[in-house]
Amino acid sequence: MATPTEIAYNRAALIESLQFTFVMDEVGKHLSEVICGFGIVLNLLLIYVIFKRTPKHMRSYAVLLFNFAIFDLLTCVASLLACQKTIFSGLSLTYIFHGPCKYVSSSLCFFCHCFVCHAMAHSQWILLISFIYRYRVLVDGAPDTKKMIVIVSLFYAMSAVIFLFYFWDIGDTNDLKQIMYDLHPQYHYDDREIWGDIVVSGNTTVLTIPSLIAIFYMTMPCVPIYFIIHYFRDKTLSTLASNALSMSPATKASHQKLIMALSIQAAIPIFWLVASGIFTLAEFGIIDGPIPENITFRLMDCIPSSSPLVAFIFIAPYREGLLRIISKTGIYRKQENRVSSVVEKFNQPPKQPTNPAQQSANNDAAKTEKV
């Protein structure tokens, strides 16, 4: 039988062995605060300038931008509240939640987690619609705002159903804890003196119809979506390069710059792919430890946090709106003469198009999206 001294020594050694895990958990918490906090500020600013600085002829496209911004904002808020740490546990999806949601309930934490996952999947569809929109503007003219609202709402209805499927399949907390204890005994998660009352939630098994549908929706469509995005991107660029449309160089440059913006936005989900790769490797036991457990969702947090930067960089009215806000703080003073010269450059009247669809395309780009 071990003496008190030996017990104390063994416990000290155990706690010492868990120090790296403690450190990585703290790093994960602070990364969540920084990344999501940054994203919340940027998306709030973007929503503000969309309402205040969107020109009349750009309103239909602003529906897509607003959809991006509002879901990115809510995703950052939900992820900050959850701050989930993935516990790779075979066929179960188990998460320890370090965010403020843990002070309310494990159900709220899982709700936030489900919202984050479904919102990121929904953003892929809005990105696809954005590329199709840009092409249709060139060949048919811009659709009206009401039509865009209907299209976006229909696509979100599909995502909302998947969200409910995923959330309703929430597992029993005690069962998930027992799975975690059995598969990860080295962490001693059952020791309250070390970990306190940890908040755990997730799916007991992924082999249920709701979970399988949700996982399929959030992972499988991304490949065909990106093929279609690439198709419409190439068609748009080839249309701009052809002589079929009678446009001024400034108008063509405007369209090309917006396509560049969408292309960069399409590259942002690389964080999702890297996170998915880490998740897969850890799920099959190829890698393990507190780094993949904490880094997976922090990488995904970078998607909604960085997305608004594309709009601010490439869309002139929003960039100007942001600079006006910053100039009021005294950090930055706007150079009126430089901005005026840029605006004057792109205010040159375009050549007359040969049909009404081309006129609408010119109006949508040259008059409202001067960059």
From Swiss-Prot:
How does this protein sit in the membrane? Multi-pass membrane protein
User: Please, which domain of life does this record's source organism belong to?
Assistant: Eukaryota
Primary residence: membrane
Location of the region described as Disordered in the Swiss-Prot/TrEMBL record: 344-371
The alphabetical list of record keywords is: Membrane, Transmembrane, Transmembrane helix
Q: Where is the composition biased (Polar residues)?
A: 354-365
Membrane-crossing ranges are 31-51, 62-82, 109-129, 148-168, 209-229, 267-287, 295-315
Q: Which GO terms describe its cellular component?
A: membrane
Q: Where in the cell is it found?
A: Membrane
Record-stated family: Belongs to the nematode receptor-like protein srd family.
PANTHER family xref list: SERPENTINE RECEPTOR CLASS DELTA-1-RELATED, SERPENTINE RECEPTOR, CLASS D DELTA
**Protein name as annotated:** Serpentine receptor class delta-1
What is the native source organism of this protein? Answer: Caenorhabditis elegans
Q: Specify the taxonomic lineage.
A: Eukaryota, Metazoa, Ecdysozoa, Nematoda, Chromadorea
